[in-house]
Amino acid sequence: MGLKASLSLLSLTILLVFSKVVTANNITLAFQKYSKFSTMRDLFIKTKLIAAIDKYQTITVLAVSNDAISSITNRSEVELRNILMTHVILDYYDELKLQGMREKSIMLTTLYQTTGLGEQMNGFLNVSKSKGRVYFGSEVKNSPLNAEYVSTVYHNPYNLSIIQITMPIVAPGLSLAIFPPPPPYVHVAPYPTPMDASVVPAPGPAADDNSPDSAVPKTPPAPATDTPEADSPAPAPSADNEKIEAADKAKPSSSASKAGWSFDVILLLAFLASFAGF
């Protein structure tokens, strides 16, 4: 009995390990086999989700064709990772199980819910059946159920299933959960730079300078010159000064007349003396 129990335990361990390896490898192989899912395969590799999926033994991947998934390829790598995680269901579903649904609507847990960042049910999906058709959408309130089931691409019962849907599912608020708003920017005014007194600008004109008179340029004072006082016009002579000047002018005339008389007398005496000699 002990030997049989040991063999059973060993077989179970090998099966679990093998199943885990098959899950990771089959995801890559399944996407490589179908070229119409090459974009989604590249996104799974780019966002390093293959290793995260490898931790689970039972999953269902909602695959989207290259044309349909192009609507989200321009998002950031973090947003792409979150969106792709909502396309990984932590349960097994294939066409048989979907068509055999008893309830009209079922809530599904996705890989994104395991991150602890889920808000308002955006880590869950809703699958509903209506008139023989199956639709997927976010479990967030009022989210549309517009991703329709197309077909089962790959299935390994109760281990791995890859099913195609018509369009990607973008749950509201995924980016908000990853990118919290930054703290508000506080503007700090710079300290004023001390200025040297020599470079301080002169005060502006006073308020009175705004009057109309201030618009007329003022004539600067004439510079002082060394011009002698004689250059300035002489004052008008008074009556007394005129008399004195007239007297001064008359004196030379009197002297001249006296000198003339003396000369005549000398000539007369000389003439008389010449007669006396005879």
UniProtKB/Swiss-Prot annotation:
<feature type="signal peptide">
    <location>
        <begin position="1"/>
        <end position="24"/>
    </location>
</feature>
<feature type="compositionally biased region" description="Basic and acidic residues">
    <location>
        <begin position="240"/>
        <end position="251"/>
    </location>
</feature>
<keyword id="KW-0325">Glycoprotein</keyword>
<keyword id="KW-0732">Signal</keyword>
<feature type="region of interest" description="Disordered">
    <location>
        <begin position="199"/>
        <end position="257"/>
    </location>
</feature>
<feature type="compositionally biased region" description="Low complexity">
    <location>
        <begin position="224"/>
        <end position="239"/>
    </location>
</feature>
<feature type="glycosylation site" description="N-linked (GlcNAc...) asparagine">
    <location>
        <position position="159"/>
    </location>
</feature>
<keyword id="KW-0449">Lipoprotein</keyword>
<feature type="glycosylation site" description="N-linked (GlcNAc...) asparagine">
    <location>
        <position position="26"/>
    </location>
</feature>
<feature type="propeptide" description="Removed in mature form">
    <location>
        <begin position="256"/>
        <end position="278"/>
    </location>
</feature>
<dbReference type="InterPro" id="IPR033254">
    <property type="entry name" value="Plant_FLA"/>
</dbReference>
<keyword id="KW-0654">Proteoglycan</keyword>
<dbReference type="GO" id="GO:0098552">
    <property type="term" value="C:side of membrane"/>
</dbReference>
<protein>
    <recommendedName>
        <fullName>Fasciclin-like arabinogalactan protein 5</fullName>
    </recommendedName>
</protein>
<keyword id="KW-0472">Membrane</keyword>
<feature type="glycosylation site" description="N-linked (GlcNAc...) asparagine">
    <location>
        <position position="74"/>
    </location>
</feature>
<feature type="glycosylation site" description="N-linked (GlcNAc...) asparagine">
    <location>
        <position position="126"/>
    </location>
</feature>
<dbReference type="InterPro" id="IPR036378">
    <property type="entry name" value="FAS1_dom_sf"/>
</dbReference>
<keyword id="KW-1003">Cell membrane</keyword>
<dbReference type="InterPro" id="IPR000782">
    <property type="entry name" value="FAS1_domain"/>
</dbReference>
<dbReference type="Pfam" id="PF02469">
    <property type="entry name" value="Fasciclin"/>
</dbReference>
<comment type="similarity">
    <text>Belongs to the fasciclin-like AGP family.</text>
</comment>
<dbReference type="GO" id="GO:0005886">
    <property type="term" value="C:plasma membrane"/>
</dbReference>
<feature type="domain" description="FAS1">
    <location>
        <begin position="25"/>
        <end position="169"/>
    </location>
</feature>
<keyword id="KW-0336">GPI-anchor</keyword>
<feature type="lipid moiety-binding region" description="GPI-anchor amidated serine">
    <location>
        <position position="255"/>
    </location>
</feature>
<comment type="function">
    <text>May be a cell surface adhesion protein.</text>
</comment>
